[in-house]
């Protein structure tokens, strides 16, 4: 099977510069000795409107740019590559490889960059040519076609040509769950599908969490819930695209993993404390951004989203400064007991999913103890007040309501280890948990 998978050793990076609706070639990627290196093209360096793809990683200068310590390819490039789901789609559609066979194949990162769809998250794309840009997978499939395609990929069944084209469009998206990209006249969405392995309504859980986050004052991506082919589909409005006369502008983005100069093998070291330090020095509106990030950490704990890894946080990049993107991928995780931990460290070596962890770290976000307490209390009351209405919007079954409420949402473990004046939060959580009819 591996003989069918080509190993590309070079690719050309194309980028949509700020305000533009067409890309220009930025430079060349080449694979060597297990690494992927980048150099800018002269035409791009001499372009008056050119910006670095990301600093300090890829400064706008001539020659091969050294990789940051520990990395095998530039992080801002890896951000544009597909993750688990997109790789399964590519291997299925292109090479007939089932998902569980991926680990046995020696596949170049450039293969995934060059075989994935062109409408990827952010402002980059990858081409075989430095002079001719040819977008891949422009077909706009129906949700029903996409649902059917996702089901076949999960089962390892080769796609038909029609379904192949339908799902390829979303093969460049990150994440492990089934998803695809869709477009209407003025808005683009990421469509997230139910999985055959789901033991409860994961899609509805994410819809509820995202809606509640927005109601709690968090800048969260807009979401809607629809049905297609008898399945729930979550539509997440893309915030990296702007519709203008003549086409679409793309907004450059980098993940927190890239900001922290880490890769997947080092992701366990990713820390909100370190991210807060970067925000203070490199972000627009640092004080407001720190408060927003603190609020997101609190909400993740209150809703049971322990999958808050560093690729689930991102910032727009304008060539000089970073700006936090809307929140996304806030999804309550399955939980059999109480004790839990976050994917990212909160401060020091502490990643425990407790409000006490947030309060202890508040000073890193330039928040006083009373300010941090007020944020937690406000979210608690907001979640409890809006839970019945948002659950109804999601047509959540009684079984799933009982599963989510008090287990993912407002799990008692989140309120352990609170001391002094903060202990009022535990009492408030107990009151709200018991007063709201799931």
Predicted feature locations:
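Phosphate/dinucleotide-binding and metal-coordinating scaffold of catalytic cores
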Residues: 1-310, 314-438
């Amino acid at each position: 099977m591996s003989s069918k998978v080509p190993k590309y050793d070079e690719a050309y990076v194309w980028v949509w510069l700020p305000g533009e609706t067409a890309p220009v070639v930025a430079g060349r990627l080449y694979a060597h000795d297990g690494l992927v290196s980048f150099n800018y093209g002269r035409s791009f360096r001499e372009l008056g409107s050119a910006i670095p793809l990301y600093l300090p990683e890829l400064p706008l200068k001539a020659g091969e740019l050294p990789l940051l310590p520990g990395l095998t390819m530039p992080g801002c490039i890896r951000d544009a590559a597909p993750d688990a789901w997109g790789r399964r789609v590519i291997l299925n559609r292109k090479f007939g490889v089932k998902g569980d066979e991926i680990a046995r194949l020696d596949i170049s990162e450039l293969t995934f960059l060059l075989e994935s769809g062109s409408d990827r998250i952010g402002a980059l794309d990858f081409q075989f040519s430095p002079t001719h840009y040819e977008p891949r997978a422009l077909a706009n499939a129906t949700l029903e076609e996409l649902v059917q395609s996702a089901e076949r990929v999960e089962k390892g069944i080769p796609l038909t040509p029609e379904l192949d084209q339908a799902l390829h469009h979303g093969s460049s998206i990150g994440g492990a769950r089934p998803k695809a990209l869709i477009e209407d006249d003025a808005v683009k969405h990421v469509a997230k599908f139910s999985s055959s392995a789901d033991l409860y309504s994961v899609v509805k859980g994410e819809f509820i969490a995202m809606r509640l986050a927005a109601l709690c004052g968090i800048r969260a991506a807009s979401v809607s819930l629809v049905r297609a082919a008898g399945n729930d589909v979550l539509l997440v409005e893309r915030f990296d695209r702007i519709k203008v006369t003549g086409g679409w502008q793309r907004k450059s983005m980098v993940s927190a993993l890239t900001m922290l100069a880490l890769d997947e093998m080092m992701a366990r070291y990713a820390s909100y404390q370190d991210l807060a330090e970067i925000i203070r020095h490199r972000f627009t509106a640092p004080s407001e951004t720190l408060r927003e990030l603190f609020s997101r950490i609190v909400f993740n704990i209150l809703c049971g989203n322990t999958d808050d890894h560093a690729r689930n946080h991102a910032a727009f990049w304008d060539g000089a400064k970073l700006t936090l993107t809307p929140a996304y991928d806030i999804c309550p995780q399955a939980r059999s007991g109480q004790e839990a931990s976050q994917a990212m460290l909160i401060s020091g070596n502490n990643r425990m999913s407790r409000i006490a962890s947030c309060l202890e770290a508040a000073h890193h976000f330039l928040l006083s103890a009373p300010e941090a307490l007020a944020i937690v209390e406000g979210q608690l009351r907001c979640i409890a007040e809006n839970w019945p209405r948002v659950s109804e919007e999601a047509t959540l079954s009684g079984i799933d309501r009982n599963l989510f409420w008090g287990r993912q949402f407002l799990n008692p473990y989140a309120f352990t280890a609170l001391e002094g004046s903060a202990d009022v939060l535990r009492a408030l959580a107990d009151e709200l948990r018991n007063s709201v009819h799931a």
